[in-house]
């Protein structure tokens, strides 16, 4: 509302096993593990200074064939550390060749621009129930008892797609969330789907604002099937 650009960052959400904790760190390790001249990435969970592969064996079998052939059963893999699976990559010389990218958060975030910089604002916990793939901000004005009122609507779109078993069994998430910016309290307020009328099912990837006969509409793109069109009231 002040003309400064704010930042909204979608993320995986909290409805997943892929979360760092006090007991374990999670990193993406990138190196030429297979000695093919092509770097590959593997998600690593480190517990008590011991690195373990985070993903299940069937999820990484094509990317890391030597890792798969080094174990004889699923139970052996389940208890094996990377030290057991790739002994050559655990010495100091090989470790120096690995790029390690730590996972810090899977939460979606928002930063509001102020005169002195960006200020992170907490998003309602409901918005963290699933992945957010796109955002849309709409400023709508209406006259109420002679006063011109403007509300800033923030919409997020997403849901689970291309899910891997290692991430856990996700609970059902609302593919769309509708927030309103409360300027007085400088916070986001969640609008229930029953109140907003934005009730969706499925996996959605993007959202756009279009004008039809001078009226604002929302065009919502889905993973499969037909797109959805809503008219603002």
What are the residue ranges of the model-derived segments?
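Beta-propeller-forming repeat regions
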Residues: 1-233
